[in-house]
Amino acid sequence: LYAPSAGIVCPFHLNIALAENANANGVEFKFDMEVTDLKKTGEIWEVHTNQGVFETKYVVNAAGVYADKFHNMVSEKKIHITPRRGDYCLLDKSAGNHVSHTIFALPGKYGKGILITPTVHGNLLLGPTAIDIEDKEGTNTTREGLDQVIAGANLNVKNIPMRQVI
C-alpha cells in the first residue's frame, strides 16, 4: 500500500520532545515508582505508590504492556493485554535510498504487516512481526521472526540489500 499522507518520525526523539514540552507546561514526572492504588475524590486523584501518595488532577496511563494493570485499578470493566513481540531488520545507511517512502503491506488480523521504510537517520527499516507471547518482558529476537520480516519485505520490494543488515 502506498500512503502519500504517511510520515516518518524518530519515535525516540519525538517522545523526548513531547516530554520536554509537557514539562515546560507544568507536567511533573515521577519515575521508578510502582502505582499500588488509585482513588478519585471529586476532581482529584490520589496516586498511591511504593514511595508515597501523590495528588493530581490528571493521570496518564503510559504503562505500556502493563497498562491493563493500571486500567483495572480504576475501571469496573477489566481488560488483559496480551504482549506481542515485533522483530525488525535495520539496514545500514548505504541501503537507505532503496525506497523513498514507507511501503505498507495489506494489514491482517495480527497487525499492519511487514513494512519497508527509510528512517529519519537515513537507514532502511523492515518489520515488524507481531507474535503473541506470554512474558511481558520478552524482548528477544528470533531467527524465525527475522526470516518472516525478510520474506514479508521481499513480497513488496525487490532486491533489498540484506547484506546491509546491521
Task: Put a short name on every predicted segment.
Residues 2-58, 66:
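Helical element adjacent to the flavin cofactor pocket in flavoenzyme catalytic cores
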Residues 1-2, 98:
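Long, low-complexity, intrinsically disordered polar/charged segments
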Residues 37, 53, 63-166:
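Active-site substrate-recognition segment that forms the wall
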